[in-house]
């Protein structure tokens, strides 16, 4: 279990992000919460500056950080600042909260590849910032779409969205 790694991503409402990412090969567990804001112990009703985020625990023997990021860029629009679908505000920004320098490098390389690919019509505005405290969201937000499959989401897989292989990719 100690070989597992963490990733923290934000890309709009955390319900849809969690519902899709938790099903990916190599993902061991997920939890939704808040990070990147000004207050301690944020809540759904009080999380100024925090992004709705997902903390992913994954097995690097089964997947890698680059694969998680490529899926992340496939399921949300990284070219809209502080917005996903009908959700508007900094809570819904696109962000990668890296836990070490290697994750930062992979994040920046992946963003460069997404921009170069032309798969999205605009330039990627995803923030890349060091991970701070991750505050777990209230229980009613955990695995929300698993419990309420008819609930709101603005995330969906785009099966034809595939980045070209990078010659020097090391994830």
Swiss-Prot record:
Listed NCBIfam families: msrA (TIGR00401)
A GO term, aspect molecular function: peptide-methionine (S)-S-oxide reductase activity
Organism: Mycobacterium sp. (strain JLS)
Official protein name in the record: Peptide methionine sulfoxide reductase MsrA
Gene Ontology biological process terms from the UniProt entry: protein modification process
InterPro entries: Met_Sox_Rdtase_MsrA_dom, Met_Sox_Rdtase_MsrA_sf
Function: Has an important function as a repair enzyme for proteins that have been inactivated by oxidation. Catalyzes the reversible oxidation-reduction of methionine sulfoxide in proteins to methionine.
Active-site residues (renumbered): 13
EC nos: 1.8.4.11
UniProt entry keywords in alphabetical sequence: Oxidoreductase
Family: Belongs to the MsrA Met sulfoxide reductase family.
Recorded catalytic activity of this chain's protein: L-methionyl-[protein] + [thioredoxin]-disulfide + H2O = L-methionyl-(S)-S-oxide-[protein] + [thioredoxin]-dithiol; [thioredoxin]-disulfide + L-methionine + H2O = L-methionine (S)-S-oxide + [thioredoxin]-dithiol
Signal peptide: none
Enzyme class: oxidoreductase
UniProt-listed Pfam families: PMSR (PF01625)
